[in-house]
């Protein structure tokens, strides 16, 4: 049967902080990019079950299966058949472009492997050498090496039967055949025999650092999802630079069959800052700081301080392209690679960034960090002070530029946090006047009939207003905010979840947005409406499968996540909501 979003409840996510993979409970690798998150996929079964490549290990007989994590980022699949069972541990070796499928089976299994190069199947030259299967891109840029360590026999052009017992199936990536000759021959069964244990130890070291426990609280049921949220964010982190991508996938649609299909495998400043903040709030200061250091290193002193998004190595993304060779998930076209949002002006992102910097500083009192980046902080604040009246695309990346209230609020947040940070190291807060001017502008231009509207002369209320008290722009009990909150609850709160808005230039907004539900939970916690905050978390928890992964959008009718998966900033705001509820109650 064709994949649908309902299947995502049984999808697992693994990472080695270079790249990542999604795997279903049928032993099928749905998505894998080598050598890093934002590379072209080597397997894109998600986007085309006929032409997206295949890497499947499953019983030959009819089977049932279950998924669970052996350890963070080590995914265990158990198959049961009438003649016996099989267990597979799937993992990516930290620091290596090597995917291992560790098998212990009472029955024979079938292996299918046929990868993609340049988004095309069969776009390779195949050869075998010393028991290894070589798949070389026809353009010479990339070699995949498949090795079966254990008893097996070839049953077809790209199929093998794996005999019962202990087996390792190893998939390695090299940039070229020449690099394989230099490096690949060092990869052998002997030095991979302890790969599973070392990978478990690698992620276990993170687990040992978790200090927050929900045991004994009325949030106890959320402990597994809290831990999963942490490891999802860590799994979206690119270890060479510390940058954090938004999500591991591309072109999973908001609406099946529609065209809201985007590539999220990049470092959005906004998303990365929110995730860095969540890491710091959980006590993972080094990882949060590295993400912030990466963003500081991106500052452009010749214009707007930050682009909206970057590749994991800090290079820029130039537009997007359509991939005609893939049919798209549930026939959702176009399949997009790259992202045009890089060309937009988004004025909120520096606010999210500096708010995360301030959160790190408040937790660590690391004055040296602030001193080292004081010039960047001052430049951001000065540029925003000079340009705050510009129109922009806003947080929702709309094609129509407006003077969005949320963007102005986040500029205010940037100037507020810049003032506090620079004052903390003995500097002068010289942005007070501009902050007051911005606040007065929002009050004068973005309030209509006693409630906040999305932009001047608009009648629309969107869910960004929920963030205003979270970021300290307005008191949560302010009468204007309370009236706006009631409108959000009446018009955007549907079947237990919150929509961003009702309409945009593409059409009606068909799905709720998990971020907005988490904002509302944090608002309720500030208002001491704890039970309602908890219910929002329970609503999200009811959607997740056994692997505790959260998507970006929710189809409130079919009760499934849609869009790219798993979504990093949603996991981050789930963490933030948990901590807000604990702090405010």
Regions found by a protein language model. Give the residues of each.
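Acidic, mature catalytic/reactive cores of soluble proteins
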Residues: 1-585
């Amino acid at each position: 049967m064709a994949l649908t979003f309902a299947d995502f409840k049984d999808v697992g996510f693994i990472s080695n902080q270079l790249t990542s993979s999604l795997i279903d409970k049928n032993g099928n690798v749905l998505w894998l990019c080598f050598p890093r998150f934002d590379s072209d996929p080597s397997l894109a079964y998600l986007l085309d079950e006929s032409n997206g490549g295949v890497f499947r290990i499953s019983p030959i007989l009819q089977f049932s299966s279950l998924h669970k994590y052996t350890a963070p980022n080590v995914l265990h699949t158990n198959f049961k058949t009438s003649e016996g069972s099989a267990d597979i541990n799937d993992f990516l070796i930290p620091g290596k472009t090597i995917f291992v499928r560790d098998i212990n089976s009472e029955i024979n299994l079938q292996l299918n492997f046929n990868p993609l190069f340049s988004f095309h199947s069969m776009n390779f030259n195949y050869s075998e050498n010393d028991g290894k299967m070589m798949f070389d891109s026809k353009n010479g840029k990339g070699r995949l090496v498949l090795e079966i360590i254990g008893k097996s026999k070839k049953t077809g052009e790209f199929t093998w039967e794996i005999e019962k017992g202990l087996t390792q199936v190893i998939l390695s990536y090299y940039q070229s055949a020449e690099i394989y000759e230099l490096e690949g021959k060092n990869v052998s069964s002997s030095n991979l025999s302890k790969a599973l244990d070392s990978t478990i130890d690698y992620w276990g070291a993170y687990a040992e650092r978790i200090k927050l426990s929900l045991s004994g609280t009325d949030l106890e049921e959320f402990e597994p999802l809290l831990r999963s949220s942490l490891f999802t964010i860590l799994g979206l982190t690119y270890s060479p630079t510390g940058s954090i991508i938004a999500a591991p996938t591309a072109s999973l649609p908001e609406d099946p069959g529609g065209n809201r299909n985007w590539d999220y495998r990049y470092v959005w400043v906004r998303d990365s800052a929110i995730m860095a903040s969540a890491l710091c709030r959980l006590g993972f200061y080094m990882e949060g700081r590295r993400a912030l250091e990466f963003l500081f290193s991106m500052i452009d002193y010749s214009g707007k301080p930050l682009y909206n998004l970057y590749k994991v190595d800090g290079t820029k993304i130039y537009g997007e392209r359509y991939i005609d060779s893939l049919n798209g998930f549930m026939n959702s076209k176009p399949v997009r690679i790259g992202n045009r949002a890089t060309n937009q002006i988004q004025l909120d992102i520096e606010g999210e960034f500096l708010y995360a910097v301030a959160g790190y500083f408040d937790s660590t009192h690391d004055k040296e960090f602030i001193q080292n980046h004081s010039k960047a902080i001052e430049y951001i604040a000065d540029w925003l002070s000079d340009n705050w009246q510009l129109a922009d695309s806003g947080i929702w990346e709309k094609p129509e530029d407006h003077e969005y209230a949320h963007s102005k609020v986040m500029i205010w947040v940037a100037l507020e946090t810049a003032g506090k940070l620079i004052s903390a190291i003995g500097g002068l807060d010289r942005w007070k006047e501009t902050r007051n001017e911005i606040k007065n502008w929002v009050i004068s231009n973005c309030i209509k009939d006693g409630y906040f509207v999305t932009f001047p002369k608009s009648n629309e209320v969107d869910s960004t207003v929920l963030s205003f008290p979270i970021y300290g722009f307005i008191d949560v009990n302010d009468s204007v905010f309370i009236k706006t909150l009631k409108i959000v609850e009446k018009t955007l709160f549907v079947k237990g979840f919150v929509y961003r808005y009702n309409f945009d230039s593409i059409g009606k907004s068909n799905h709720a947005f998990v971020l907005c539900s988490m904002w509302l939970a944090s608002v309720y916690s500030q208002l001491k409406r704890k039970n309602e905050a908890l219910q929002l978390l329970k609503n999200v928890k009811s959607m997740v499968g056994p692997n505790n992964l959260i998507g970006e959008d929710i189809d409130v009718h079919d009760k499934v996540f849609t869009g790219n998966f798993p979504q990093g900033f949603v996991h981050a705001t789930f963490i933030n909501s948990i901590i807000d509820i604990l702090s405010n109650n």
